[in-house]
Amino acid sequence: MNTFIWLIRREFWENRAIWIVPAVIGVALTVAALFGRIDFHTVVPADQQRMIGPTVLLAYGFTFFAVMSIYSSWYLMECLYADRKDRSVLFWKSLPISDTATVLAKLFTGVIAIPLVYFIAADVSTLLMAFIVSMRAHAYLGSVLWQPGLWLQLHVLWLYVIATTGIWFLPFTGWLLLVSAWAKRAVILWLVLPPLALYAAEQWFFGSHIFGSQLAERALGYLPRAFHDQSNPSAWTSATIGTDVITVPSSVWHVLNPIGFLSSAATWAGVLVGAAMIYGAIQLRLRCSES
């Protein structure tokens, strides 16, 4: 366990962008809250006031999550390749650390540690934003931003998304690690060209698109399985702001669908595929180290 923790710390030492990028985003959003324009005079109807808190907090959270998704994917694509590129793999191989532990530490960093860092950064910056906006707008916005139940739901949503996306997108994660362990150069080309070639070959020789359909299902199938849809009107709240109709969940508890997600065969089929690719990355790392 101590070795694994040390490996995680090593990833943070060598990849300072893990914490620098979310810190920069947090500072930028805090500055925007401090100096941005707030309309103190417009009278907002009660139904729209109920929308302000969830909409603002979700927008802040989505900003961090979008950047986190891009950076985490980039990290997983580069982590094993970079060790070989700068030949630091030879140094780490000289230590009593297994290749399995090294790959799993990088997997943990990309799937769990980085999302948690962004979660903490989003939490702190959102608290600062709410405090600044409340002070600037006095009681006008304070009552809609400082709701303990809303903050609890935001935290639960973040942790739920971290856990479920880590499971659902494990095939993509495994592919990123596999390519990172295999490619000697042009990692992005190795990442993209084999799936495209397989898709084209299936279309050419068999006239089918099963592979492409499975990729699309994996890329787009997360939300329908992890969350309930809008079939239950009582679970959603809508309000018209200007010419736009904004709809948000009346409560996070109404839209989370952990039972449906965990009982889906597609979820666990993806886990098996992802685990196989991660195992392949470990074997490639071992062979690379031996050669």
Regions found by a protein language model. Give the residues of each.
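Short amphipathic alpha-helical coupling elements at transmembrane boundaries
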Residues: W6-W13, A82, L90-S94, A181
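Secretory targeting signals
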Residues: T30, L34, Q48-W74, L104-A181, ...
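Hydrophobic alpha-helical transmembrane segments of multi-pass membrane transport/permease proteins
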Residues: A17-T42, Y60-S73, L193-F206
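Transmembrane helix segments
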Residues: A183-S231
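Helix-loop-helix units of permease transmembrane domains in multi-pass membrane transporters
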Residues: C79-T109
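Aromatic- and glycine-rich beta-strand/loop motifs that create alpha-glucan
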Residues: M1-A23
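Membrane-embedded or membrane-proximal helical elements that form or frame transporter/channel pores
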Residues: H41-K85, A239-A265, A269
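Junction motif at the cytosolic side of a transmembrane helix
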Residues: I8, L178-I188, G242, S250-S291
